[in-house]
Amino acid sequence: MNELKNDRYLRALLRQPVDMTPVWMMRQAGRYLPEYKATRAIAGDFMSLCKNAELACEVTMQPLRRYPLDAAILFSDILTIPDAMGLGLYFETGEGPRFQSPITCRADVEKLPIPDPEQELGYVMNAVRTIRRELAGSVPLIGFSGSPWTLATYMVEGGSSKAFTKLKKMMYAEPQTLHLLLDKLADSVILYLNAQIKAGAQSVMIFDTWGGVLTGRDYHEFSLNYMHKIVDGLIRENEGRRVPVTLFTKGGGQWLEAMAATGCDALGLDWTTDIADARRRVGDKVALQGNMDPSVLYAPPARIEQEVSTILASFGQGEGHVFNLGHGIHQDVPPAHAGAFVNAVHALSRPYHQK
């Protein structure tokens, strides 16, 4: 494997010195880019794009050709694991992801297989290997998975949900069934992320998109507990360097201390958490990633720069900050505004890293 020419992102996650704050964007390979839409049209549909290593590599690289980003993120979907378990993932136009065979009872959970990442999910590993070759050491590659709780929301609800009534019914009426499902998912995620690391992912991230819908007690029992199990099971050294692990619970700002205690290297923040407050609370234990509201990218470039400046000042001097949005970039953001954001982070952050 090639030596990394730019390891700013990996260094920041380990709270090591950098020359400027590294930046990448959640969903940086996506529908806001016309070239992404063109490639997706060639693939035919979203999952065909994910399952074609060459096309997945192409869309992963597209934002890097436009912007001086400090990391690439694997182009895939969090629902690859439930799909590999046989739930029958499909996408309804305007409805998002759906499953043909959602989980309804304990018997459904008991018969779920734990997928072999090099077999049922081999297309993901092929994409990781293809992207690493194409990157040729330019920037690190981030691998990722959904958290067990977040995967369970889709598997039990049968797709996207606003109220999560089916899953919460299971959580309160049949908690042991849900624990069995979450435990199987945690085992699957460990295998999946370790396979991504062996295939070439240099950092991994666990997306807990729906952890924020839980009470504090339930978050610890049904979400954080299983992310902790995953962190404990991950390969943390590969290719002669540490493989940093980032946890991100959207809406989880009140639980940062407990998240930091899992042994992860970094925490993702959404835009509802003040980054100065987060640093005061956990900055001696973990790096922080975030946390500009993605909607700021609708503003003119001068306003975007102002927001970047405010967040940099809020985090303050020193190491341990990876700049990002607080969630994924919106599909109708002008590409030039994303460029203004990336350039502003690099231009304005250097003074915060001078000794």
UniProtKB/Swiss-Prot annotation:
Q: Which gene encodes it?
A: hemE
Q: Which UniProt keywords apply?
A: Cytoplasm, Decarboxylase, Lyase, Porphyrin biosynthesis
**Catalysed reaction(s)?**
uroporphyrinogen III + 4 H(+) = coproporphyrinogen III + 4 CO2
Q: Which GO terms describe its cellular component?
A: cytosol
Enumerate the residues binding substrate: 27-31, 77, 154, 209, 327
Supply the name of the protein: Uroporphyrinogen decarboxylase
GO MF terms listed in the record are: uroporphyrinogen decarboxylase activity
The residue ranges crossing the membrane are none
- Give the lineage: Bacteria, Pseudomonadati, Pseudomonadota, Gammaproteobacteria, Enterobacterales
Q: Which family does it belong to?
A: Belongs to the uroporphyrinogen decarboxylase family.
Q: Does the keyword Lyase apply?
A: yes
Q: What does this protein do?
A: Catalyzes the decarboxylation of four acetate groups of uroporphyrinogen-III to yield coproporphyrinogen-III.
For this protein, the record's Pfam families field holds:
URO-D
Q: How does it assemble?
A: Homodimer.
**Which pathway does the protein contribute to?**
Porphyrin-containing compound metabolism; protoporphyrin-IX biosynthesis; coproporphyrinogen-III from 5-aminolevulinate: step 4/4
The record's Gene Ontology biological-process terms are:
protoporphyrinogen IX biosynthetic process from glutamate
Alphabetized InterPro entries for the sequence: UROD/MetE-like_sf, Uroporphyrinogen_deCO2ase_HemE, Uroporphyrinogen_deCOase
Keyword Lyase annotated: yes
The protein's location, in the record's own words, is:
Cytoplasm
Q: What is its EC number?
A: 4.1.1.37
- In this chain, the site described as Transition state stabilizer is at 77
